[in-house]
Amino acid sequence: MAAQALAAQAVASRLQRQEEDIRWLCAEVQRLRDEQLRGPERGQAEGPRLTREVAQLQAENRDLHQRLCGLRLRLAEQRRTEAGRAAAHEPPTQNQEKDTKKKRLKQSEPGREVKQPNFIKERLQLFETLKTDHQLLPATQEKKNTNNVISVRVAGGKTVQGERWKTTPYQVAAGISKELAEHTVIAKVNGVLWDLDRPLEGDSTVELLMFDNEEAQAVYWHSSAHILGEAMELYYGGHLCYGPPIENGFYYDMFIEDRVVSSTELSALENICKTIIKEKQPFERLEVSKDTLLEMFKYNKFKCRILKEKVDTPTTTVYRCGPLIDLCKGPHVRHTGKIKAIKIFKNSSTYWEGNPEMETLQRIYGISFPDSKMMKDWEKFQEEAKSRDHRKIGKEQELFFFHDLSPGSCFFLPRGAFIYNALMDFIREEYHKRNFTEVLSPNMYNSKLWETSGHWQHYSNNMFTFDVEKDTFALKPMNCPGHCLMFAHRPRSWREMPVRFADFGVLHRNELSGTLSGLTRVRRFQQDDAHIFCMVEQIEEEIKGCLHFLQSVYSTFGFSFQLNLSTRPEHFLGEIEIWDEAERQLQNSLVEFGKPWKINPGDGAFYGPKIDIKIKDAIGRYHQCATIQLDFQLPIRFNLTYVSKDGDDKNRPVIIHRAILGSVERMIAILSENYGGKWPLWLSPRQVMVIPVGPACENYALQVSKECFEEGFMADVDLDDSCTLNKKIRNAQLAQYNFILVVGEKEKINNAVNVRTRDNKIHGEISIASVIEKLKNLKKSRTLNAEEDF
């Protein structure tokens, strides 16, 4: 043991000397780079050589760190073993026996935290060793010819001086205002998200992001996920997997052997999270070699998989808060106390990376905010959303249902089918105005089609496949490959471009059973899918047409929307000149369209840039439904060509993938919740209710209902003798009939009806012919407020 201690001391001493050399060399490289900006001759001559020296020393240091950690771990293990042997020969004291009994009693109590797993202690020991012996950033030590003064410009504000490797964004913020520093969630340094307590490394532009910023929210919820992860480790003792921020909150997945999470345990987890928050545990960042992290997380096969499969660099980062140390790129808030309000509200089961053949994981969801008022507003919002839940409305209004014998495939009842068909009729009318041609394509294809399109290699697990006469077939999950066959079935000329194919074909996707959720996530659905085959020079005009199309549809529904242009990603296919031209035309289309839009650099698909559209519903939620996506790759894969003006028959078209509703099922869910079940007349599954004042008028009521039905309205008659007239009217209003037509002897004589609305606005006696004519005009115009416009 003494020999190992001496070896560890020698390695540590050598490591310290080399780290001093690295600090000096790093500072020298930075100085030379700064000089290069002012006078490039010297910086160009010496910079590369010194950079290579730094890299060589750092590589050697990584090896030394691993040796040092190994030596110290073995040394610590030997000490624990010897201490254990010594303790085994000592009889327990009376107090120790009492403590042991108390611990056992505590662990046996239901709802109490389990004993802290052994791996937590071992993980912490290694982290502390690494933290002591391997500081992430060079210390600020004065060296010959080293200038540590840096310029820090606060975005939109003043410029201050700082010290390299020492000044932090938090100090910069505090220098402006303590209140500003306390309310800042995260910093952005030279365009990169940065921990507030992480020292700056050179001249910097610093942005200070508050919670109202989307990136800051993601960081805030990511830090909250770490708090939840710490609580889950303490409570369940399982192995953590992924814990990301999501659109509204966060979750953490955990593998727990032989048990599942119960919703009754969520309040206990929430209390542990609140304790962690009170402790104000700092978030500590450390960059560590991949090999050392494999040793640190050897107890957790999921973290080891991430390291082996996802990390392609020699080092990566971990973050610590309290006893939790987690693989994480960060950044994070300063400490757990920054989370002022937290709620753990839901749990479910899932699979490792969504693969049903892999391990089952327990997923727990949470939400957090920087003040309690925001939490109360969120809870109020959840109650409102719950009352508008499309599954609740679908059941109450008898629109649709699901059955275990066909999970993920909706059964639309007559009134739900009316809404479905009304939406498709609306889009068909728009197709006719905009020169789209509707086509019908097969539901199943040989797998060779999907191999050609590239979907088989990347998407086959999400397809329903089966064997037919020794060949593999699949139900189509999208229409585009079939439309490529339709375009290619005969020669095409520039004269017929653009070709616009529209298809309401049935699509199937093999979604995991645990992800199915009402109409928003299904296995069987239809889209208002269209593919435009056009020449490159036609892109701008076609995109403008798509934008006006979606504006027309969304304004009819009463939706506002956001536009985002996603441009060329780092890894893309195709010629850069074509990408540049396509992006230029997309930008021109957006500018001419005249609505606000943002750019998402590098967020396009690998096969083409796109415009993402999010609609905003009545309670402020955003939903992505429409898609406008350019595709340069499918025309190549299917060898699509057209004959140009000069007779060249090898010209490639560009494909524009375009959907407005997206999935019709999902749009019905969104519309149900947006309207809260109060459908506008043209979409309403209950448009007219006819109510006779007594038995003598029932035949006339049936006649009025028949006339309405023959004109295309969803009309019903209430002939229930057990209800009073007022009760019948109230029932019709609660059932959301847009118009209630009351008929008595007077109306019967005058061939009229007495009109009132579901909001009890009384329009009085009107002839049945006039009522039907007005209703037809209101339905045709697709007005949102037919009851007011009547």
From Swiss-Prot:
Record region (Disordered): 80-117
UniProt-annotated location(s): Cytoplasm; Nucleus
Biased composition (Basic and acidic residues): 96-117
Catalytic activity, reaction form: tRNA(Thr) + L-threonine + ATP = L-threonyl-tRNA(Thr) + AMP + diphosphate + H(+)
Outcome, altering residue 226 to A: Impairs post-transfer editing activity but no effect on aminoacylation activity
Ranges of residues in domain TGS: 148-210
Main location: cytoplasm
GO terms classed as biological process: threonyl-tRNA aminoacylation
Alphabetized GO MF terms: ATP binding; threonine-tRNA ligase activity
The keyword Phosphoprotein is annotated on this UniProt entry: yes
Keywords for this protein: Acetylation, Aminoacyl-tRNA synthetase, ATP-binding, Coiled coil, Cytoplasm, Ligase, Nucleotide-binding, Nucleus, Phosphoprotein, Protein biosynthesis
Its EC number(s): 6.1.1.3
Record Gene3D superfamilies: 3.10.20.30, Anticodon-binding domain, Bira Bifunctional Protein, Domain 2, Threonyl-trna Synthetase, Chain A, domain 2
Similarity comment: family membership: Belongs to the class-II aminoacyl-tRNA synthetase family.
Complex and partners: May be a component of the multisynthetase complex (MSC), a large multi-subunit complex which contains at least eight different aminoacyl-tRNA synthetases plus three auxillary subunits AIMP1, AIMP2 and EEF1E1. Interacts with the MSC components EPRS1, AIMP1, AIMP2 and KARS1.
Biological role stated in the UniProt entry: Catalyzes the attachment of threonine to tRNA(Thr) in a two-step reaction: threonine is first activated by ATP to form Thr-AMP and then transferred to the acceptor end of tRNA(Thr). Also edits incorrectly charged tRNA(Thr) via its editing domain, at the post-transfer stage.
Name of the featured protein: Threonine--tRNA ligase 2, cytoplasmic
Organism lineage string: Eukaryota, Metazoa, Chordata, Craniata, Vertebrata
